[in-house]
Amino acid sequence: MRQIVPKVVVVGAGMGGLASAIRLARAGCEVTLLEAREAPGGRMRTLPSVAGPVDAGPTVLTLREVFDDIFEVCGQKLDHHLTLLPQPLLARHWWLDGSTLDLTTDLEANVEAVAAFAGAREARAFRRFHDLSARLYDAFDRPMMRAARPDLRAIATGALKAPRTWPALLPGMTLDRLLRLFFRDRRLRQLFGRYATYVGGTPYGAPGVLALIWAAEARGVWAIEGGMHRLALALARLADDQGVRLRYGAPVARILRQGGRATGVQLADGRTLPADHIVFNGDPAALLAGCLGDGPQDAVPEDRIHPRSLSAWVWSYAARASGPPLVHHNVFFADDPRREFGPIAAGQMPEDATLYICAEDRSGGQLPDGPERFEIIMNGPPGRPAKPEDFAQCRSRTFDRLRQFGLTFDPVPGETSLTAPSGFASLFPASQGSIYGLSPHGALASLKRPLARTALPGLWLAGGGAHPGAGVPMAALSGRHAAEAILADLASRSR
């Protein structure tokens, strides 16, 4: 008897879509991957510059084992496809009073650096914070981040075995409040509080458990030679090798539904593709908003989508830099975090912004000869419509501020180098410009993200808007969860 090959359509070639397509094709499914734009990557996008394509999306690669696994499943090695450069110096941090702090992957070096920066008392506090972060990471890694569905029993058991994690798990314990239990120095609270923005939150609303992000970074950070977008290109090539049909410039207009099940997709040009299963690698808010027709509008509950996480103003450009010695990852802190996050909460551009700079051509430790590529990120509110004065205001609040640190660029980038919250809203339908999906604020926010399986049979989710959440490795893990759920469903039907 001839075996029927399952047909899967993956909508969106972001990290989650690529990861799911690769695994499903490797398992024997007939996979078609549809991408509206002309290149893979989703939020891992680029803008042109005189120095070559410059990243305009994620800049930090952690948990490389997630990507090693994708290639190993296919009998290949990640290092044969990409050059990953370990970054022992995680980031250089700057304050306007002239103080700086380098943090690395070496705990003892960090303790010494914090002691020189803020004194012996704060160095001891840092060691205790590092220990808490590592314990939180160990407690939540497998039952939360690596699991297809958060395993509450395993999380509770892990927490009970690690009583030192309890303060971070108390109701109402925000990241800012937790940091105040450790650090007297406001600069250290500001530094580690910034980790809330990694998942689209603020230290005043995000739960204390997000302290585990420090441990994830301390385990290792890598740069990719040529830029982060090279990862998306490598995964697309791997998908092609596995037999995935990649179709770029193929926007999907509708997800089709018949008999209470997702049955295929209709492209913007009117053509239809039938499918046994569909993986939607996009913001789940687009389903609820009807951006893909009325068929999947009830696939995801609204409380799994709203409220929204932060957006950003992102500069991507090439220039010559003069001033303080930049490394690959740099953070120039605001004088007063309340003047950053207060306006953002009110839907406004921050008055006193913390600015993150990725100097992506400095990953090898050498100064480039000529213009080099930069990405600067300033946090912003979601749902903010574009205003005529935004560009001039953002340019001033970015580059005038950096000039106060002695950092200048020649030339200063123009309007085509800036992606505003309204730009992200246009790029990612129904997202309201939110970069990270559901807001991480509240103790249970991480448990509310939609899982791979939706309420509409045959429709599955992947991407940063689904469990386990925002970030490059998290999005890739969501693709794994979607693929494994589909394969489990197929196996159960074949019995």
Swiss-Prot record:
Associated pathway: Carotenoid biosynthesis; spheroidene biosynthesis
Alphabetical UniProt keywords: Carotenoid biosynthesis, Chlorophyll biosynthesis, Oxidoreductase, Photosynthesis
Enzyme class: oxidoreductase
Domain of life: Bacteria
Catalytic reaction annotation: rhodopin + A = (3E)-3,4-didehydrorhodopin + AH2
A single BP term in Gene Ontology: photosynthesis
Note: NAD, NADP, and FAD have no influence on enzymatic activity. Another unknown electron acceptor may exist in Rhodobacter species that replaces molecular oxygen during anaerobic growth.
Main function: It prefer the acyclic carotenoids such as 1-hydroxylycopene, and 1-hydroxy-gamma-carotene, whereas 1-hydroxy-3,4-didehydrolycopene and 1,1-dihydroxylycopene are much less effective.
Identification of the protein by name: Hydroxyneurosporene desaturase
UniProt gene name: crtD
